[in-house]
């Protein structure tokens, strides 16, 4: 982040902006995150302290904020009598640090909160920027800020909506990853953002390392022997022992193991972090060249590589600051949508009237059958998570998959516009209609209202279809809901669930991040409370927590598609927040039975369906434990260690929500990042606080009984954690 920020500030200064630029990236990081932070007990430098009396006098929405957070100045980013503005003034530019949502100090509010407002600190931050510093423009630097997720209408925001209240009429320029058009669209709709796209980290083949290399060599020897060779049994025993050492357990035959080794070796992984304003090296361009030729022709790849050589992202930012027109471009990931380059442009999404496309319907049908073949019998009900991002980038592939499972297709009017759903006859379908319990991200709900109504229509029509109940699981379950709950069939047929209007996420990830939960049922309750709103034929929502709980009892397995090559299920917390959250909710609803969880992968080449355990093992093998993944991250210093910590925290999130993480993975993560003295020292020097969190997450996994190391390992881990804690206390709060 700070390397990118430094490059942007340097370019702005060269264009005439009055900026007091430090001499280096490290100095910039220190004065922003360190500075006087120790003096005030804050996590970053304090620009200014705003007294509580000033907040009371100047906050126009004080009553609404106090109803949620109590009297000003509140407890967030506060000394009890005032609020701190964090960041650093650099001449005519302020590098500000957006305050947190505020739930971090009281995570149980995630379960019970009915309304919401930003904290005193959050509102004061934006008011200070507008009225005191008098900014001419905001540049939100990097996606996943909190502003666009504040309460209010999903589109056409007004003075009653918090995004409008906070940003006012100040232009909003937003630097955003090119592969996330869905959340970028949300920022456009709710904060009037002009998006400036940037590339995601370059990708590289994972390759093999340490024990994996030796294992592959042994398997090659085994495959070259004749079936009657006396050495074959000895090699087979050796292979099994070697495979255990590198956590290969899920294979039936040596040939199956061989395919899994090749899958690991060929997997694409992020190679470090993307830096705004830095040219791609020749080595990384060669990596791009290698895997792009798998799906694009020679001429296309050559043109693409020429575009990648050009630095356009900083210019996009400065052009926007100068009030120039920023050319639009569809968003997507580089492998599937090479037209996203050159970046530095204003990404947009799709044509909602034609989603899912015909191609997506064909692909979705094939993927649905592949998923069903993974399970031993036809499932009665499937819990499927649908995000906006992967559907926008794939023209609705996941939507098409849900429709295919239900035995339905989209209905289009004479103008080719989506207008509902139609059922496929059972004779054409050739199998039972699978009941699909769909939980949507808040972004899907906001950006794809036509598709929400289409999915609701498909479930409703299937519920009304006069068909044998053993061939129509949707109708069978609807009739049972109707009888057991004494509700009308229209309510009993509801299958599309999400947050209430204006709310986002299940908040399970917030509980995991703060470690402030006692047992897994709290996670299930939080998910149900947040996602218990059903969306019907008219697209409107009603609170249906009891119906959701009833539907969860019937679920045989949970499923979600991967969003992109770059973002695995252990890379970001969104996956366990949604898929993990509903899996835990199913377990509570059905009385404690753990259900299978599957991951669909259509990001590259032939589609695949893996169990969650297989997916986590693959990602841990190719990313977390792979020097080719973590060594480039460490070259980015502070931020790289934070990424490693996030990977381990997300792994813990899967243990908490599904219990489907191999305990041995924690052994290997401990050995790699904490028990190795040289690695521990390096992590601590680069980011003391994040390195301590790595050790504490591993200890938390033990304390929550997700992993039981031997006593020597546990003692060494505790000793390492104590050493890291001493380091943090020794360097003080200014360390970050």
What are these regions (language model features)?
Residues 1-736:
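Ligand/cofactor-recognition surfaces for anionic moieties
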């Amino acid at each position: 982040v700070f390397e990118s920020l430094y490059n942007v500030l340097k370019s702005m200064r060269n264009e005439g902006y009055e900026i007091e630029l430090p001499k280096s990236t490290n100095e910039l990081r220190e004065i922003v995150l360190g500075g006087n932070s120790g003096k005030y007990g804050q996590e970053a430098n304090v620009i200014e302290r705003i007294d509580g009396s000033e907040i009371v006098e100047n906050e126009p929405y004080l009553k609404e904020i106090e109803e949620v957070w109590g009297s000003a100045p509140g407890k967030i980013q506060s000394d009890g009598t005032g609020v701190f503005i964090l960041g650093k003034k650099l001449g005519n530019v302020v590098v500000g640090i957006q305050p947190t949502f505020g739930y971090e100090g009281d995570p149980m509010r995630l379960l019970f909160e009915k309304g919401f407002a930003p904290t005193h600190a959050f509102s004061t931050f934006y008011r200070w920027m507008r009225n005191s510093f008098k900014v001419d423009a905001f540049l939100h630097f990097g996606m996943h800020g909190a502003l666009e997720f504040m309460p209010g209408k999903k589109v056409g925001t007004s003075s009653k909506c918090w995004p409008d209240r906070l940003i006012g009429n100040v232009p909003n320029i937003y630097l955003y990853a090119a592969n996330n058009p869905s959340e970028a669209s949300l920022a456009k709709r709710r904060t009037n953002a002009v998006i400036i796209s940037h590339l995601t980290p370059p990708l590289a083949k994972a390759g093999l390392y340490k024990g994996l290399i030796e294992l592959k060599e042994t398997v090659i020897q085994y495959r070259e022997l004749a079936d009657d060779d006396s050495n074959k049994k000895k090699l087979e025993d050796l292979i099994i022992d070697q495979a255990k050492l590198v956590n290969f357990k899920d294979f039936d035959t040596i040939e199956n193991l061989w395919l899994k080794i090749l899958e690991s070796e060929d997997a694409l992984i992020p190679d470090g972090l993307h830096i705004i304003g830095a040219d791609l090296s020749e080595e990384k361009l060669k990596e791009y060249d290698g895997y792009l030729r798998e799906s694009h022709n020679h001429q296309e790849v050559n043109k693409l590589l020429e575009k990648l050589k050009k630095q356009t992202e900083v210019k996009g930012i400065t052009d926007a600051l100068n009030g120039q027109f920023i050319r639009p471009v569809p968003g997507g990931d580089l492998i599937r949508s090479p037209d996203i380059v050159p970046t530095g442009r204003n990404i947009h999404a799709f044509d909602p009237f034609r989603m899912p496309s015909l191609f997506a319907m064909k692909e979705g049908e094939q993927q649905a059958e592949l998923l069903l073949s993974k399970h031993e019998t036809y499932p009665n009900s499937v819990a499927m998570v649908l995000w906006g991002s992967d559907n926008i980038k794939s023209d609705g592939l996941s939507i098409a998959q849900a429709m295919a499972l239900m035995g339905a297709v989209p209905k289009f009017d004479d103008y080719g516009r989506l207008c509902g759903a139609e059922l496929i006859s059972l004779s054409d379908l050739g199998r039972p209609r699978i009941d699909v319990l769909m939980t949507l991200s808040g972004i899907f709900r906001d950006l794809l209202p036509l598709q929400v109504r289409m999915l609701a229509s498909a479930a409703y029509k299937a519920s009304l279809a006069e068909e044998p109940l053993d061939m129509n699981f949707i109708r069978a379950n609807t009739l049972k809901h109707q009888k057991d709950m004494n509700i009308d069939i229209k309510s009993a047929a509801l299958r599309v669930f999400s947050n209430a209007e204006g709310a986002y996420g299940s908040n399970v990830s917030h509980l995991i991040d703060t470690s402030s939960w006692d047992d897994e049922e709290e996670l299930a309750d939080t998910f149900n409370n947040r996602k218990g709103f059903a969306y019907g034929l008219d697209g409107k929502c009603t609170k249906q927590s009891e119906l959701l709980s009833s539907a969860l009892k019937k679920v045989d397995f949970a499923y979600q598609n991967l969003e992109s090559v770059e973002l695995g299920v252990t890379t970001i917390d969104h996956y366990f927040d949604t898929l993990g959250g509903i899996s835990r909710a199913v377990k509570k609803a059905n009385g404690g039975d753990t259900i299978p969880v599957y991951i669909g992968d259509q990001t590259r080449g032939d589609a695949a369906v893996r169990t969650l355990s297989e997916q986590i093992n693959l990602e841990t093998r190719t990313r977390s434990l792979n020097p080719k993944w973590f060594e480039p991250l460490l070259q980015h210093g502070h931020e790289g260690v934070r990424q490693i910590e996030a990977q381990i925290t997300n792994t813990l999130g899967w243990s908490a929500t599904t219990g489907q993480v191999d305990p041995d993975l924690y052994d290997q993560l401990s050995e790699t990042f904490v028990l190795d003295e040289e690695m521990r020292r390096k992590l601590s020097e680069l980011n003391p606080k994040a390195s301590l969190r790595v050790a504490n997450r591993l200890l938390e996994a033990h304390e929550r009984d997700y992993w039981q190391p031997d006593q020597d390992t546990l003692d060494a881990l505790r000793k390492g954690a104590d050493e890291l804690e001493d380091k943090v206390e020794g360097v003080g709060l200014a360390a970050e």
